[in-house]
Amino acid sequence: MVQKAEIKLWSTNVESLNQVVEQIKAIAKKTGVRMRGPIPLPTRRLIVPTLKLPHGEGSKKWDKWELRIHKRLVILDADERVIRQIMRVRVPEDVYIEIRLR
């Protein structure tokens, strides 16, 4: 039975996230490893309402600030040389990666 590697990526910047996913896809294609994904997972929206007026008197006016966290899942056959190449991929500061072997 072949071991699988689940690579979960998340970021607030969708362009840099897709860039890292494309690098992983290129590695999988170059080495001939079977790959599933990238599977887009649900985007998490964090909304923070803040009161515009500092003293709280008068009519209540609110600002809403939103942060979106985009997620992707890639599943690969866990070959040792492929995992080493993925570990060498340049990852921007705003992209987070979690690799789980199954």
From Swiss-Prot:
The keyword Iron-sulfur does not apply. InterPro entries: Ribosomal_uS10, Ribosomal_uS10_CS, Ribosomal_uS10_dom, Ribosomal_uS10_dom_sf, Ribosomal_uS10_euk/arc. One of its GO terms (cellular component) is small ribosomal subunit. Keywords: Ribonucleoprotein, Ribosomal protein. PROSITE patterns: RIBOSOMAL_S10. SUPFAM superfamilies: Ribosomal protein S10. One of its GO terms (molecular function) is structural constituent of ribosome. GO terms for biological process: translation. Involved in the binding of tRNA to the ribosomes. PANTHER family: 30S RIBOSOMAL PROTEIN S10 FAMILY MEMBER (PTHR11700). Belongs to the universal ribosomal protein uS10 family. Part of the 30S ribosomal subunit. This is Small ribosomal subunit protein uS10. It comes from Hyperthermus butylicus (strain DSM 5456 / JCM 9403 / PLM1-5). The gene is rps10.
